[in-house]
UniProtKB/Swiss-Prot annotation:
Enzyme Commission identifier(s): 4.1.1.39
Cofactor(s) recorded in Swiss-Prot or TrEMBL: Mg(2+)
Major subcellular location class: plastid
Gene: rbcL
Binding site for substrate: N127, T177, K181, R298, H330, S382
Catalytic activity: 2 (2R)-3-phosphoglycerate + 2 H(+) = D-ribulose 1,5-bisphosphate + CO2 + H2O; D-ribulose 1,5-bisphosphate + O2 = 2-phosphoglycolate + (2R)-3-phosphoglycerate + 2 H(+)
Pfam families: RuBisCO_large, RuBisCO_large_N
Site feature: Transition state stabilizer: K337
Protein name per Swiss-Prot or TrEMBL: Ribulose bisphosphate carboxylase large chain
Group of enzyme by EC: lyase
Organism ancestry: Eukaryota, Haptista, Haptophyta, Prymnesiophyceae, Isochrysidales
Length: 488
């Protein structure tokens, strides 16, 4: 027997000895590992407990998210365990964060059921976030191989088909959320929908927590909302929609509500992130089968995505939701009232809209990603935005986005229709200025003032909200900053 064979045999024998062996010595750490095209890659931000070696922490994460438990088990010998072990292959210190490390882990594709987000997440985020050896842990990014992505449906409709169905091209789509969230009767709710759509919006929207409460059952809301949609469409000659929230206690109830919305002629239905991954995928499949756009409200995401040291980065949620079948997802505004660093938001939007995503560390994109022809998911900008920010919104977010002005429509002093008209005129004048080649970013406020001379609702809105912004420091910011290239 050669010396090399003897060495491999000895290492393998030691690896399977009974008792507790460090994860790194059990095969979960391999700095020489060669990444395969079919591997799933995950990047964790890990803060080990004092005294825990970062390499051992990374190996523990790899082990506990794949095949390991706390001690050696003899049944490992009955499997292709060397193949099925996840491999931690790289550990880097996080810039400007003491005792915190980026841990790169590769998973063999056979560890995951095809097309099942529930199975994927049960491994990747299943129990390692409660692991005592780490003080804090965050899933920052993932890369999915084309072979796995081909087993996922992707967005039910996609950007191109949605624009064709809505007959809206060359500009962002406009929407608003009905306010107040709760308490309106069905008839009053439908009136809000009608006024907003008649004033120039493309969509009105249920909020995340309006389902089927005693003050307004879902059938009332759906009926009156669709009456408003159809009336506004007839008056304006435009295709209109209202996101009818089908979120419910059971899948049977959700299908019942979605079928009712479809039968009423709705072009779009809505779900909340809190319904869970299996329910989201199920509704994605239903939407594809029924030719209905699927809007996802990210209700609950900030409970685990906002803090930088523990939880999960929202870009991972964006990837999972694009895979699972959602056509829309709220992804930040930059200038609104909700968490949103400009670089991070750009990374979210690129994740949802790119056909191939390149590595971009300032935007938090650690892996290149080929999206395997999955359709694009439309980002939704919602929360504390108004027409006075239109030039900033177009500059930051581009055309493939839904701009949701809730309070910025329904809070207009002259009424909902006037608020909608103000937003539509602001959008149209800014897109026109951009298409004419003007410096609409620098001239934005003046462009809006000029348009307001012939649009009373816009003038009123500009006078009311002026340059209101929500300037708070973001908690989730880039770890790597863009720097100028030096001339040598």
């Amino acid at each position: 027997m050669s010396q090399a064979v003897e060495s491999r045999t000895r290492i393998k024998s030691e690896r399977y000895e009974s008792g507790v062996i460090p994860y790194a010595k059990m095969g979960y750490w391999d700095p020489e590992y060669v990444i395969k095209d079919t591997d799933i890659l995950a990047l964790f931000r890990c803060t080990p407990q004092p005294g825990v070696d970062p390499v051992e922490a990374a190996a523990a994460l790899a082990g506990e998210s794949s095949t390991a438990t706390w001690t050696v088990v003899w049944t490992d010998l009955l499997t292709a365990c060397d193949l099925y072990r996840a491999k931690a292959f790289r550990v880097d210190p996080v810039p400007s964060a003491a005792d915190t490390y980026f841990c790169y882990i590769a998973y063999d594709i056979d560890l995951f059921e095809e097309g099942s987000l529930a199975n994927l997440t049960a491994s990747i985020i299943g129990n390692i976030f409660g692991f005592k050896a780490v003080k804090a842990l965050r899933l920052e990014d993932m890369r999915f191989p084309v072979a796995l992505l081909k087993t996922y449906q992707g967005p039910a409709t996609g950007v191109v088909v949605e624009r064709e169905r809505m007959d809206k091209f060359g500009r962002p789509l406009l929407g608003a959320t009905v306010k107040p969230k709760l308490g309106l009767s069905g008839k009053n709710y439908g009136r809000v929908v009608f006024e907003g759509l008649k004033g120039g919006l493309d969509f009105l929207k249920d909020d995340e927590n309006i389902n089927s409460q005693p003050f307004m059952r879902y059938r009332e809301r759906f009926l009156y909302s669709m009456e408003g949609v159809n009336h506004a469409a007839c008056l304006t000659g435009e295709v209109k929609g209202h996101y009818l929230n089908t979120t419910a206690a059971t899948m049977e109830d959700m299908y019942e509500r979605a079928n009712f919305a479809r039968d009423l002629g709705s072009v779009i239905v809505m779900i909340d992130l809190v319904i869970g991954y299996t329910a989201i995928q199920s509704m994605g499949k239903w939407s594809r089968d029924n030719d209905v756009i699927l809007h996802l409200h990210r209700a609950g995401n900030s409970t685990y995505s906002r803090q930088k040291n523990h939880g999960m980065n929202f870009r991972v949620i964006c990837k999972w939701m694009r895979m699972s079948g959602c056509d829309h997802i709220h992804a930040g505004t930059v200038v609104g009232k909700l968490e949103g660093d400009p670089l991070m938001i750009k990374g979210f939007y690129n994740t949802l809209l790119d056909t191939k995503t390149e590595v971009n560390l300032p935007q938090g994109l650690f892996f290149a990603q080929d999206w395997a022809s999955l359709r694009k998911c439309v980002p939704v900008a919602s929360g504390g935005i108004h027409c006075g920010q239109m030039h900033q919104l177009i500059n930051y977010l581009g055309d493939d986005v839904v701009l949701q002005f809730g309070g910025g429509t329904i809070g207009h002093p002259d009424g909902i229709q006037a608020g909608a008209t103000a937003n539509r005129v602001a959008l149209e004048c800014m897109v026109l200025a951009r298409n004419e080649g003007r410096d609409y970013i620098a001239e934005g406020p003046q462009i809006l003032r000029d348009a307001a001379k012939t649009c009373g609702p816009l003038q009123t809105a500009l006078d009311l909200w002026k340059d209101i912004t929500f300037n708070y420091a973001s908690t989730d910011t880039a770890d790597f900053v863009e720097t100028a290239t030096a001339n040598v």
